[in-house]
Each structure stands twice: as structure tokens, then as C-alpha cells.
Design a protein with these regions (language model features):
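Glycine-rich loop-to-alpha-helix module at the N-terminal edge of alpha/beta enzyme cores
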Residues: 30-121, 132
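Hydrophobic face of alpha-helices
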Residues: 46-49, 68-75, 79, 86, ...
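ALDH superfamily catalytic-core signature
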Residues: 223, 231-380
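Terminal low-complexity tails and localization/encapsulation signals of metabolic enzymes
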Residues: 1-36, 69, 73, 121-148, ...
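Residue-level signal for inorganic ion chemistry
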Residues: 31, 67, 89, 111, ...
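Rossmann-like NAD(P) dinucleotide-binding subdomain of oxidoreductase/dehydrogenase enzymes
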Residues: 123-267, 320
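Generic non-transmembrane alpha-helical segments
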Residues: 73-81, 186, 190-196, 269-270, ...
Length: 383
């Protein structure tokens, strides 16, 4: 039987009030069931907010250097468990081990950096225009921060949001993407092992349209940080603006790499391959457009197709793999759809453009690395 994981609310691992769970499977092998995770509802968010407020009352009174020491211990624990977490992350979301090891390293670096900032939360003194008066400013914690994070950097992005918030004395409610709940579970375990007071962090799994919405709309969550799609971020921005909340948004992009005729083509190509196919192209900063000077166009495209065709497609836990699976069925269908749109508009599929065949690829969300040529300004795939 698969393990039923739980939310972390009010200092305890608890089942969702809905009683519902969803499956978390390896995108490289559908038969590999990692576990079942809570499909939480608004009542779970309400409980998490109440607990986080209690945690905030305690944590905000803890001296910042002491808060920093907790984060230093978090960083040390991440160092100790780096390989374990990287392998769990690759199993859960598919990207290759060198990338997930880098993901954990981002968390380590962020923890150790945040630790040092605990002794640098400086205020300011300001000259006054009035006699016998002086003015000053100092930093104060805000309250409960709601953090909504994506699947593509399951540990790095949560730490970028969470560690500064914790260092500054805030409590956090953490809502990870539905595709990467296990990595989130491991991160919260480490926070607790490092000595973070239990009610300072809450972990609520579930759908963004339910859990994320309830968190964003809750009047006692004054800070929201979101990384994800532009469409969802726009809705969150509207809600937070209406409710006068503090907000951080990091959303999608359509990124171009420009190669001029005096470029080092080998160096440029390294950048293109990493930008386009790293994390299987599933990054807000991924290179989805390549604009090439006409003098070197044919040469660079030929080099690109040759290198891209030699990228090894497979499970991220395999040391030979260069490109892993897409995160889920919807992601693969979206790629297939836009390749079809490009064909219909007159673009040429130079390589890829289809699902792969072969041993080990039939039970995962794999798609061949694809290059479209003959793309003109104004085509949907170019926009």
C-alpha cells in the first residue's frame, strides 16, 4: 500500500479535513507511485492561518541572530541530506541528477546567506529638521506569509521565499505545486529538525485553485509570494491589490537568445542547449526563441540540430541521461499542441516533433528535443 502523507498544521502531521488524497507518480515511470498526498480544502487553510498567527507571536519576538542560527542548522542538514533529497526530487519531477543536486545547493547557499543576514537587519537614522528631535527607522516582521511555489525548482524556489521571510521574523504557510509534494515534505522535516518552532511553518498540500485561492483571499495572510503562470499570477495580483496585501510575483516568459555574426558559435550553442533543454525546457527563463544573424544562421542551425539530436533522453536518475521527461501529461500535450500549431503556420520541424520510442520511454511523459525552423515574426510559436 502506498504511504499516505499528511499536511503539517498546528505543529502536527495531520490528514486533510476533506479526507481526500491525490497520487504522486514518477513522471519517468507511471508505475512508480511515490505516495498519496492531501487534497486539502479551505478549512485546512483556516487552521493553518490560525496556527501560523500563534507561531508568529512567538517567532517575531525571537532575536534575529537566533533566527539566523536556526537557518544555519537548516543549511547544514541540507548538506548532510543533499544526495537523498536530490534523488527524491529527480524521482518526483524528472530533471536529471546534476540539476537536482544544484537545486539542493541553492537551498544550502540561501540558508547560510540568510543566517548571516540575521546580524545585518539594520535600520536607519535620519537627520531631523526640528530641534532636539531625531528620526529612525527599523525593520519589523509583518505577519503570516503565504508561499505558493512551482514544480520546476522544488527546493530552491521555496527556500528563496521561505528563508528570508523566516529570518525576518514572519511565519509561513507553504503550498507547493501538486507535482512535487514529497520534496516539500522533506524540506519541512528539515526545518523542524533544525529547531524551527513548529507553528512557525505550515505545509498545506492541494490544488492551487482551492488551497492557493483560500490562502490568497484570507484576510489574515498579509504577504503573498507566488511563482507560476502569468494567468494565475494576474488573478493573484488583482486579489492582493484589492485587499492591500504585500505581493511578490514571478511569472512566465518568452525568452529569446540572440546570436550575432561575430559570436563564438560553440559557446553560443552551449548556452542554447542549456537554456532550451535544461529542466526539459520547463523554466520561466528557458530559451524558447533563437534569433540568429543571417550570416551564421545556416551554420548554427546545423550545429544545433546535430548536438540536440545527440542528447540522451531518459530517466533523470540514469547517469547517461541529458534530458528527462516533462512533468505530466498536460505538459506533454501542450508541447505537442504548439508543435502542431507551428507546423500549421508553416514552420519546419528540423528535429524531434514527436514522442520517442524505445525501452524505458514508453511509460513516461517523454518528448523528443525539438527544433522548429523557418519561424517568422508573428507566428504563435514565436510570441
Amino acid at each position: 500500500m502506498p504511504e499516505n502523507f499528511k499536511n503539517f498544521i498546528a505543529g502536527e502531521w495531520v490528514a486533510p479535513r476533506t479526507g481526500a488524497f491525490f497520487e504522486n507518480r514518477n513522471p519517468a515511470d507511471w508505475d512508480d507511485l511515490i505516495g498519496c498526498f492531501p487534497r486539502s480544502g479551505p478549512d485546512d487553510v483556516t487552521s493553518a492561518v490560525a496556527s501560523a498567527k500563534r507561531g508568529f507571536a512567538q517567532w517575531s519576538q525571537t532575536p534575529a541572530p537566533i533566527r539566523g542560527e536556526v537557518l544555519h542548522r537548516v543549511g547544514d542538514l541540507l548538506v548532510q541530506r543533499k544526495e537523498e533529497i536530490a534523488r527524491a526530487m529527480t524521482r518526483e519531477m524528472g530533471k536529471v541528477l546534476p540539476e537536482t543536486r544544484g537545486d539542493v545547493q541553492e537551498g544550502i547557499d540561501t540558508a547560510h546567506y540568510a543566517h548571516t543576514e540575521g546580524r545585518r537587519l539594520f535600520g536607519r537614522t535620519v537627520p531631523s529638521e526640528l530641534r532636539n528631535k531625531w528620526a529612525m527607522s527599523f525593520r519589523r516582521p509583518i505577519g503570516v506569509a503565504g508561499l505558493i511555489t512551482p514544480f520546476n525548482f522544488p527546493l530552491a524556489i521555496p527556500t528563496w521565499k521561505m528563508f528570508p521571510a523566516l529570518l525576518c521574523g514572519n511565519a509561513v504557510i507553504f503550498k507547493p505545486a501538486e507535482d512535487v509534494p514529497h520534496t516539500a515534505h522533506l524540506l519541512v522535516e528539515i526545518l523542524l529538525e533544525a529547531g524551527l518552532p513548529p507553528e512557525v511553518v505550515q505545509l498545506v498540500h492541494g490544488e492551487g485553485s482551492v488551497v492557493g485561492k483560500a490562502m490568497v483571499e484570507h484576510p489574515e495572510v498579509p504577504v503573498v509570494s507566488f511563482t507560476g503562470s502569468t494567468e494565475t499570477g494576474s488573478v493573484i495580483g488583482t486579489t492582493c491589490g484589492r485587499m492591500h496585501k504585500r505581493l511578490s510575483l514571478e511569472m512566465g516568459g518568452k525568452n529569446a537568445m540572440i546570436v550575432m555574426d561575430d559570436a563564438d558559435l560553440d559557446l553560443a550553442l552551449d548556452g542554447v542547449l542549456w537554456g532550451a533543454f535544461g529542466t526539459t525546457g520547463q523554466r520561466c527563463t528557458a530559451t524558447s526563441r533563437l534569433v540568429v544573424h543571417e550570416r551564421v544562421h545556416d551554420t548554427l542551425v546545423r550545429m544545433l540540430c546535430d548536438r540536440a539530436e545527440r542528447l540522451h533522453l531518459g530517466a533523470g536518475l540514469d547517469a547517461k541521461t541529458d534530458v528527462g521527461p516533462l512533468i505530466n501529461e498536460a505538459a506533454r500535450k501542450k508541447v505537442e499542441y504548439y508543435v502542431g500549431v507551428g507546423r500549421d503556420e508553416g514552420a519546419q520541424v528540423l528535429i524531434g516533433g514527436e514522442r520517442p520510442t524505445g525501452k524505458g520511454l514508453e511509460r513516461g511523459w517523454f518528448y523528443k528535443p525539438t527544433v522548429l525552423g523557418g519561424v517568422r515574426a508573428g507566428m504563435r510559436v514565436e510570441q
